Amino acid sequence: FNTRVQFEPLDFIQVNQALNRKMVMRALELLELESTDTVLDLFCGLGNFTLPLARQAAKVIGVEGDQAMVERARAAAHANELQNTDYYVCNLMSEDLSKEPWLKRSYERILLDPPRAGAKEVIPHLGKLKAERIVYVSCDPATLARDAGELVHTQGYKLLGAGVMDMFPHTAHVESIAVFAR
């Protein structure tokens, strides 16, 4: 992806870099990006997906609850000479997201990579954004399944496919990925 990210010892970052690279590549493939797309990257962290997305899309909006992570994501975008990213600090686990400025924009694509608890609070807002495709990456298939039900049954999306990646060999944990379309 021709991107570099600096991080602190306590920052969250995928430790299995080989599989992380494959996961990011797969997410980009599933999004079917056009060079004119605006993409919303929820739970963006340091920019694991944001930076590669910015190499292929017209604009990427990253949203993350941790101010320090957002500052490092901005610094990474600057260091990688990416000028088509914007970042917002927002607790995506909040019950009331309706006043958030990033929810007032339009997006062709959305990527979510929430923590183990999932994206229950943000899912009800995604239907209003009318994105054509959503890729949901999760470290907990159970919360992905719960949120997929909401996307399909109340937000008007169709599940096109899902799979898992063995991001954590020799453990019971997997990284799951699903793609939805309208």
Which ranges hold each PLM region?
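Rossmann-like S-adenosyl-L-methionine
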Residues: 1-182
